[in-house]
Structure formats: structure tokens, C-alpha cells
Amino acid sequence: MAEAYKQAGVDIEAGYKAVSLMKQHVQKTMRPEVLSGLGGFGGMFDLSSLGYREPVLISGTDGVGTKLKIAFMMDCHDTIGIDCVAMCVNDIVVQGAEPLFFLDYIACGKAIPEKIAQIVKGIADGCVEAGCALIGGETAEMPGMYDENEYDVAGFAVGIAEKSKLVTGSAIQAGDALIGLASNGIHSNGYSLVRRIVFEQAKLALDRVYEPLSVPLGEELLKPTRIYVKPLLNVMKQFEIKGMAHITGGGFIENIPRMLPKGLGAEIDYGSWPIPPVFDLLQEKGNLLRHDMFSIFNMGIGMVLAVDSEMIHPVIARLEELGEKAYLIGRVKQGEGVSFAGGAMS
């Protein structure tokens, strides 16, 4: 039976080997609340020891998108999993959640055990950084659906928060300050446009260093998404964070309004933080307007926090103590939308 399945394109033995290779990576993510081992039908997590009075579960799911195409071209698969975790846990921490556990889904044209193990290593690295356990997943070999050397990765995170400490944005008011946390480059959004600019318009090579970059283009494009969970959870224990926005697809223009109450908007001080050079390269080669860049990419800010104006300096100081690069980037204003002040948006 296994041989007949193999002739149809599904190698069961390769799947077993992949599971064996990934076990060491999964094990390092374990938390004491995990009651199940790798290979069960479902993952089990005991909430009873966490001590919440009114626990609220917060979940998020996401994938890596067409950034995967760069990984295929570079034959580099050990950081894509970090991206997958980051996209999920950053989305739930903005509501005040501590990530508890994570599950992944990998679909591929051909199960190459060593490649699957590399992907899972990245997922496990991301889980360790976020403090959550990798309690389950699925690797689906799907010949005819994907090319042999291609795959897709998605994930699902579940976190918990005390009901009274949920971060909803409802307390935000005009005059509150906006603090931005530095990104690690492009992160995981906008890669369909990135690939169009790089390969179709500018015809750039991934192994070359282009001004103003300091590393080969492929290395720059594969930099993993920053995971902000631990510093944000730490800061929330000391200060009231009124709202948070994970800057993903849609950039500043779409994501900052998602945390704001109706009738309020944001004024951003253009030039108040350093914009990574990769965005200058993409703007130049893609012949894009600066405003367009801010509606697509994170432009060097991966997370935005809304705090009382009196809390600016202590919050930034604490974030910097935790290793974050934090900037006062603007303020909340009356009137909806995102506007820019202080520089030419050319």
C-alpha cells in the first residue's frame, strides 16, 4: 500500500523521517502546561494553573505569503517559520494576549525531510522567542497541487488575557502619543510588489549588494519578522498601553486606524525614525511615491503603541532597556485617517 501511495507521489516514509527530524526542535518550545506529545490527534494545554480570574482566549492565524518565493530561490528555509509565528503572535499581543500555544500547517509538493525540518526549526525558534509551545501541526504532501520544490506555510496561535486587562483601544483620546518600535526590514508583507520590482522591473540579482544596502539583496529580503511579544508583555505590566497596531499589509495607512476609536486619526511625524535603506531601494526601482510606500510597507516601524502623553519618556526608556529601538512618531488627532507632518513625502 505504501509503495502504491509513493507511486502516486506521496512518500509516507519521508513523512515519518520529517517528524523524527523535527522532534528536537519542537521539544525546546514545551511549557509545563502542555499535556500531549508530538504525534497525537490533538494538542492539549492545561489552563488551570495560570491563575486567571476571568480568562479570555485570543486567537490569530496567518501565513507568510509570497515571501516564500524568495526562500525557494535562495534555498533557505530556516527563518520562514519565524515569519509565520511572528505574523500570528504579534497580532494577538496587540490585544494584550500572552501567547500560549501554536500550531502549524505545511503543504508541499514533495516531502523532503531535511527541508521540512528546517521550516519547523524556524517555527520552533519563533515559538521560543514568543514564549509559546508548538503543540501540533500538519505536513501535507500534495503532488499536483504544488511544484516539488515549493510549499506553503500557515500557523495558528492562541493566547490568553485577563478580561479586565484587554487592550481594546477604547480609552485612546486625541493628544495621546504614538510610539513606534523598529522593524527588521520588510517583514512579511508586500512581497508580491517586491518581487515585481526586483525581478520584473529592475531585474536585480539576489546575490548582489546594491546601494544603499550593506548585505546581498536576497539576505535583506529574507530577514525574519520581528517578534514583539516579550517586551510588550513586560511593558504592559508597568504602564497602561491604550492601544497597539501591528504594521502589516496596508502599512501605516490601514493598520494604525484599526486600533483607534471612531472619530480619531493619527498624525505621523515624518522623519522621526530612520527608514531602512531597503525601502529607499524599492521606492527608487519601483518608481513609487512615498505615500504609496506608507500604504504598503511598514517603513521601519513594525508596531505602534498609543500611550498617554505623560508616559512617553518612561515607556520609551523601558522599551529601550528591553532591547527595543523605540521612537516617538506622532500623536492621536481629532478626525479619522492618517496624515503626515514634518517632511516632504516625495
UniProtKB/Swiss-Prot annotation:
CDD domains in UniProt: PurM
E.C. numbers: 6.3.3.1
Gene3D superfamilies assigned to the protein according to its UniProt record, in alphabetical order: PurM-like C-terminal domain, PurM-like, N-terminal domain
UniProt KW keywords: ATP-binding, Cytoplasm, Ligase, Nucleotide-binding, Purine biosynthesis
Gene, per the UniProt record: purM
Family according to the record: Belongs to the AIR synthase family.
Keyword Lipid biosynthesis assigned: no
Biological or metabolic pathway of the protein: Purine metabolism; IMP biosynthesis via de novo pathway; 5-amino-1-(5-phospho-D-ribosyl)imidazole from N(2)-formyl-N(1)-(5-phospho-D-ribosyl)glycinamide: step 2/2
Name of the protein: Phosphoribosylformylglycinamidine cyclo-ligase
PANTHER family: TRIFUNCTIONAL PURINE BIOSYNTHETIC PROTEIN ADENOSINE-3 (PTHR10520:SF12), TRIFUNCTIONAL PURINE BIOSYNTHETIC PROTEIN ADENOSINE-3-RELATED (PTHR10520)
Subcellular location field: Cytoplasm
Any GO MF annotation of the entry: phosphoribosylformylglycinamidine cyclo-ligase activity
Gene Ontology, cellular component aspect: cytosol
Pfam families: AIRS, AIRS_C
Gene Ontology BP terms: 'de novo' IMP biosynthetic process; adenine biosynthetic process
InterPro entries xrefs: PurM-like_C_dom (IPR010918), PurM-like_C_sf (IPR036676), PurM-like_N (IPR016188), PurM-like_N_sf (IPR036921), PurM_cligase (IPR004733)
Catalytic reactions of this protein: 2-formamido-N(1)-(5-O-phospho-beta-D-ribosyl)acetamidine + ATP = 5-amino-1-(5-phospho-beta-D-ribosyl)imidazole + ADP + phosphate + H(+)
Organism superkingdom: Bacteria
